[in-house]
Amino acid sequence: IKNYKNLRELSIDSLARVNLIVGCNNVGKSTLLEAVSIYLANGNDEWLKTILDFRGEMVNVDSAKGDVDFSQVLSEHYSSLFSGRKMDFRNATAISIGEQSDLLNIKLVHIAEEQRGGTIVRWVYNDDDADSGEHLFRYIGDGLSVVSGSNAPMLIPFFRRGFPGNVKDRVPFENVLPQDFHLRKNVLLFDRISLSDREGYVLDALRIIEPSIDRLNFLNENEYSNRRVPFVTLKDTGERVRLSSMGDGINRILTVILALVNCKGGVFLLDEFETGLHYTVQTQLWRVIFMLSEKLNVQVFATSHSHDCINSFIAVNRGGQIIRLDNRGGEIVAVNYSDDKEMEFIAQNGVEIR
């Protein structure tokens, strides 16, 4: 990962099926997950805007309030993705994510427009093109060029509001943030796996906190609303209970596991594993995550700065690894822990690896 926010040049030697990313505050754990998600989304403009919105960097501009320089506004928005919030036209400052053989690159470019056989074509140009005289084009503004592997560049112009792109994800992936307890998206995620064996995995996870749960469904919250919310029935009484009344922990587990089981053959990203979870249930949830990651072929990236989370991960580890991010003189470096004996020593001696 190169030139993405505070990750000027981060290399991770190896990855496991389940990866726990640890480190002190503001070292770049969440930033690492963001970079992975951008790679998985093939740099899709809509996903970039979603990330900017998550971080409060995307401002909705009301054009009715007067002249709005969208080029300036969008340039400021997207510059927050680059190291030092600075982007220029040099390759040296471009964002790069991925393996050397299959990089995703994002850089600032000039965008030109010309007529080709009755069709208006937009493309990236440089000063050599302007000097050569080979093209009859006009410069129409600046923007981002996103190149994924050997694919043609996708252009994100700053001079107008963009339209939703038609860029497909590399693989299925879901991203769960610390504040995600009652996602509206959960309804869609549940519908995708309803009546399949994956619905059973969700129920098993909820039983970590409430063993008497029998069934789960998303129902209209009342007769006056079309909004669907999760309800469960209890084995002993048959009573139907709204899940939101059972506490944050069980709702967090629902969000986590619904997202995970929708990533079959893909990647699951979980920021701050321990959020909303009492330490007594963390080991059981890790056990479920390890089982599902293997059964559904899902690669997992989770972050934490909690000793309870780290120790519970180590207690049930099955081929996973811990990646510690360190700030060494302003440069973020990664240290991998994957050896079982090494992890056992960490757990038994309380070694500081956060």
Protein language model annotation of sequence segments:
Residues 1-50, 237-353:
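Switch/communication elements of ASCE P-loop NTPase nucleotide-binding domains
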Residues 42-255, 323-324, 328-354:
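Phosphate-coordinating catalytic segments in nucleotide- and nucleic-acid-processing enzymes
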